[in-house]
Amino acid sequence: LFAGNLNAETKTYKMVFVPASEKGDESDYTSLIAITEKLTGFNIDTIKVTDYNAAVEAMRAGRAHIAWYGGKTYVKAAEIANAEAFAAGVRPGEKDAGYYTYFVVKKDSKLKEFKDVKGKILSLNTIGSTSGDLIPQVELNKINLSIKNKDHFNKVFYAGSHDACLLAVLNNQSDVCG
């Protein structure tokens, strides 16, 4: 969680979020909101935005006080919206916050090794997503592939969400989802 523009007089804070699933509502964050309200004593109202840049802009403009960002977006928010980290999500049974990035293909795909993605159609989540854009690009760079190099992929596109990225593979619009 990241905060900006907080003060002691305010009792209701606005939390900006980018939907984490196709449902597209704050139910993805219900537990987080309840815990934050309980621990701080503040009321939390939510603001839904469609992308990470809009979340940062809401905080920069003072329309939001709290946000749930990935690592890449946090760096931007810290620079332009004075965001400060005050909590991190940790999965049950794990010691540290971290990211998992998966490259997904169909079960019957001929892609058996990571290097086989060269020349294929790649779908990613959204621009600015740490787990669905930045980390996949880092992993591709480790095997000397770049989404910016037209010779490396037949096509690269942003599907718009994790769910949409997976659906692109299932619907044969993409060979691999990162």
Segments from the language model and where they lie:
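Bilobed "Venus flytrap"/periplasmic-binding protein-like clamshell domains
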Residues: 10-11, 15-37, 49, 72, ...
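Short helices/loops that flank or line small-molecule/ion binding pockets
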Residues: 53-67, 80-81, 115, 161-178
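Acidic/His-rich segments in extracytoplasmic proteins that coordinate ligands and/or metal ions
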Residues: 71-77
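N-terminal, post-signal-peptide region of Sec/Tat-exported proteins
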Residues: 30-70
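Structural recognition of the beta-strand scaffold that forms the well-ordered cores
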Residues: 46-48, 66-68, 87, 123, ...
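Sec/Tat signal peptide C-region and signal peptidase I cleavage site
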Residues: 2-9
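Ligand-binding "clamshell"
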Residues: 77-90
